[in-house]
């Protein structure tokens, strides 16, 4: 108790500035959910795609572990189309080592997104077994999901977006869904063993080998806007993936939300969680990259995490890239759910535990207190709810004059002190 009070006293004299609310404006192209089935059916009815799905074929459709907008609807629409062609669809989880690296765990991940056999009207065949389908250009064995390998055709359903740990022409998208998603635990380990330094090489190298040696028919890829909504759908034939995925990734970059001020002294993140990013908080937003092979996001000297989302179930991955957190976060951590993914991807930094303070106020205070070469009486603080929802954020008074004429920022309130309760918490 004495030590606790001593630590609190070290930061108690650090005053915190007034904050004001702003609304950030981003482009918002959007496809309404009710329009999605018609768009997908329209693409797949073209001869280039329809000719690949023939009566009697058993066709595997991939489904991943990310919370993609309208993912259940997209998957069902593809399955319904396959059935309309007289073929037999089934869904395979394509998520590397996620879901606890077990068949049942991966099926449960899909069910949490509404991807169930009853909704789809077709089986979900989940297995961690893989089958060798060939070798890549460097002579390395290539394995994919056993059920997919034995199918007559594979349709890759996925989202295309920037990755959080490496840069290249193929990041999170079709190639990665094949190389790591369909590769299961084996594929994830092989690619990650080489490190993120080589990921931009390994993902397309394994992906191309899968296109050449597995019955991949085509891909149905979605892109999301800054509001986590479907804004584009693309159908890509297997033989066109190499050429057409990179431009789609470039387009996905343009739709990413961001914090419209370039830098701050302290970034306060109300919640992190796997439902916001595979990294807990998306470093493309927060600048908290786990490797030197990707960059971007806001330039913050300190990052403060106040809470975990309920949906992350104690998985505090990403916490290790913050400077300080709260006892509230510490008490929720489920290390058993945090560590497996970190071990598989060979990057341990995200599951470290930063300095733990008793309250929200103390956590923010210690971040300001330990910044170097700043005006500690008027610090530049940015507060966001999470790394996914960035329309409404808060800025400290130091930004007030600066953003008044910013074309993408609308001031929504006057500066006020944060409403800490008697324990120093915001909720």
Give each language-model segment a name:
Residues 1-38:
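N-terminal amphipathic/basic leader segments beginning at the initiator methionine
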Residues 4, 283-288, 292-427:
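C-terminal non-catalytic interaction/assembly regions of soluble proteins
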Residues 44-60, 83-84, 261:
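Glycine-rich phosphate/diphosphate-binding loops that line cofactor/substrate pockets in enzymes
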Residues 58-60, 265, 302, 380:
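Residues that mark the start of a beta-strand
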Residues 58-67, 90-97, 382:
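Short glycine-rich or small-residue beta-strand-to-loop segments that form or flank ligand, phosphate
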Residues 69-89:
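Histidine-anchored nucleotide/phosphate-binding helix
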Residues 105-169:
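An acidic, phosphate/nucleotide-engaging active-site surface
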Residues 143-273, 287, 296-298:
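Conserved, well-structured core segments that form the ligand-binding/active-site neighborhood
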């Amino acid at each position: 108790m004495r030590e606790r009070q001593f630590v609190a006293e070290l930061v108690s004299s650090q005053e915190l500035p007034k904050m004001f609310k702003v609304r950030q404006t981003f482009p918002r192209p959007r496809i309404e959910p009710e329009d999605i089935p018609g768009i997908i059916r329209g693409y797949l009815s073209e001869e280039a795609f329809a000719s690949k799905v023939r009566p009697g074929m058993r066709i595997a459709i991939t489904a991943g572990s990310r919370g993609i907008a309208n993912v259940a609807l997209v998957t069902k629409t593809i399955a319904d189309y396959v059935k309309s062609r007289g073929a037999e669809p089934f869904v395979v989880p394509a998520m590397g080592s996620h879901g606890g690296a077990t068949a049942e765990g991966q099926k449960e991940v899909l069910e949490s997104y509404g991807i169930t056999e009853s909704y789809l009207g077709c089986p979900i065949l989940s297995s961690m077994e893989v089958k060798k389908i060939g070798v890549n250009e460097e002579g390395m064995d290539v394995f994919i999901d056993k059920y997919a390998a034995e199918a007559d055709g594979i349709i890759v359903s996925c989202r295309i977006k920037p990755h959080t740990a490496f840069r290249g022409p193929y990041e999170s998208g079709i190639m990665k869904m094949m190389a790591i998603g369909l590769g299961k635990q084996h594929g994830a380990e092989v690619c990650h063993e080489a490190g993120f330094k080589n990921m931009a090489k390994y993902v397309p190298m394994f992906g191309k080998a899968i296109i050449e040696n597995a019955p991949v028919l085509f891909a149905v890829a979605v892109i999301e806007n800054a509001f986590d909504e479907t804004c584009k759908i693309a159908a890509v034939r297997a033989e066109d993936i190499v050429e057409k995925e990179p431009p789609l990734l470039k387009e996905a970059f343009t739709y990413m939300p961001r914090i419209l001020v370039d830098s701050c002294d302290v970034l306060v993140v109300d919640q992190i969680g796997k439902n916001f990013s595979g990294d807990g908080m998306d470093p493309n937003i927060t600048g908290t990259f786990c490797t030197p092979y990707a960059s971007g996001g806001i330039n913050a000297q300190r990052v403060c995490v106040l809470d975990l989302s309920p949906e992350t179930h104690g998985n505090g991955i990403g916490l290790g890239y913050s400077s300080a957190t709260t006892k509230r976060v510490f008490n929720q951590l489920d290390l058993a759910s945090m560590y497996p993914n970190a071990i598989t991807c060979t990057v341990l930094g995200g599951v470290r535990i930063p300095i733990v303070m008793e309250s929200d106020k103390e956590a923010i205070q210690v971040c300001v207190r330990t910044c170097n070469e700043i005006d500690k009486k008027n610090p530049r603080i940015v507060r966001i709810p999470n790394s996914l929802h960035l329309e409404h954020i808060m800025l400290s008074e130091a930004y007030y004059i600066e953003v008044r004429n910013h074309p993408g920022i609308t001031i929504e309130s006057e500066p006020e002190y944060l409403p800490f309760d008697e324990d120093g918490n915001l909720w």
